[in-house]
């Protein structure tokens, strides 16, 4: 059991002070001012106790948040793993699933993309389920709608990779150019981008992200864990190994 020594010292200091007050006057009861002065003097002598208190609070919040997230993952596993509207890259029957919430305009999402690709190349038992989460503005929404529309033409993976490689904001013109490069039907793509079905997918993804406690992109779900931020290949492999038996 971890003991917070500064707070133990504060308790001892207060007991000593109270003992002195009672020695001077057996009927004396420490006043609010007496207690405040003791605490103030102690904190001035031990300022590190404030930092320790903040760190302890943050760690407690982190653990509680992780526990809530783990429970939410279990309760929403079907939406995470079996939603037919979520594009998948890798063998659809692969035993290990990684769910990624991402935004095409997110720099860290772009940074981790080559790592995700390498992971899929080296680990054929892994599939990545993509949850479009456009949180960074109109260009993000445009890109996500285009990617989901491209999925209807069987071209999600190449369109996804090209969107992540776009230099600068993702505009309607950029999407038209990518559509032409991949030989897709532009008129159909535009129709699907504006369809209620695509809009509903994005709304559903946002609600799911909120339920799980996703606060940033990229965020990954591996097993029962929600992991925010970009990771290197070794970290992905560690998490896969840790969760492969679940």
Language-model segments: residues:
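Flexible, active-site-adjacent loop/turn segments at secondary-structure boundaries
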Residues: 41-42, 47, 79, 86-87, ...
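Structural alpha/beta surface segment adjacent to cysteine/selenocysteine redox centers
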Residues: 99, 104-105, 110-185, 190, ...
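N-terminal targeting signals for export/organelle localization
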Residues: 2-3, 12, 16-78
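A short beta-strand-turn-helix
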Residues: 78-96, 120-121
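A generic local structural motif
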Residues: 83-87, 114-115, 206-207
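C-terminal cap of thioredoxin/glutaredoxin-like
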Residues: 5, 24-40, 60, 177-246
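Gly/lys/ser-thr-rich phosphate-binding loops in alpha/beta enzymes
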Residues: 2-24, 93-122
């Amino acid at each position: 059991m971890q003991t917070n020594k500064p707070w133990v010292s504060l308790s001892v200091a207060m007991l000593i002070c109270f003992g002195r007050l009672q020695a001077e006057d057996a009927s004396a009861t420490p006043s609010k001012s007496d207690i405040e002065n003791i605490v103030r003097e102690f904190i001035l002598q031990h300022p590190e106790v404030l930092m320790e208190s903040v760190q302890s609070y943050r760690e407690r919040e982190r653990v509680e948040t992780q526990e809530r997230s783990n429970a939410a993952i279990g309760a929403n596993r079907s939406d995470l793993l079996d939603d037919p509207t979520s594009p998948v890259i890798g063998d659809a029957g692969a035993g290990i699933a990684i769910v990624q919430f991402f935004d095409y305009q997110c720099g860290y999402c772009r940074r981790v993309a080559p790592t995700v690709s390498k992971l899929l190349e080296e680990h054929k038992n892994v599939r990545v389920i993509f949850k479009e989460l456009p949180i960074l503005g109109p260009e993000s929404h445009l890109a996500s709608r285009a990617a989901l529309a491209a999925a209807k033409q069987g071209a999600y993976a190449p369109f996804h990779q090209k969107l992540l490689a776009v230099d600068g904001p993702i505009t309607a013109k950029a999407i038209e150019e990518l559509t032409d490069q991949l030989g897709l039907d532009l008129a159909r793509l535009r129709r699907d981008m504006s369809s209620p079905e695509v809009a509903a997918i994005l709304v559903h993804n946002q609600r799911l992200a909120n339920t799980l406690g996703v606060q940033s992109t990229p965020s990954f779900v591996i097993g029962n864990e929600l992991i925010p931020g970009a990771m290197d290949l070794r970290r992905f492999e560690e998490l896969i190994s840790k969760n492969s038996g679940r």
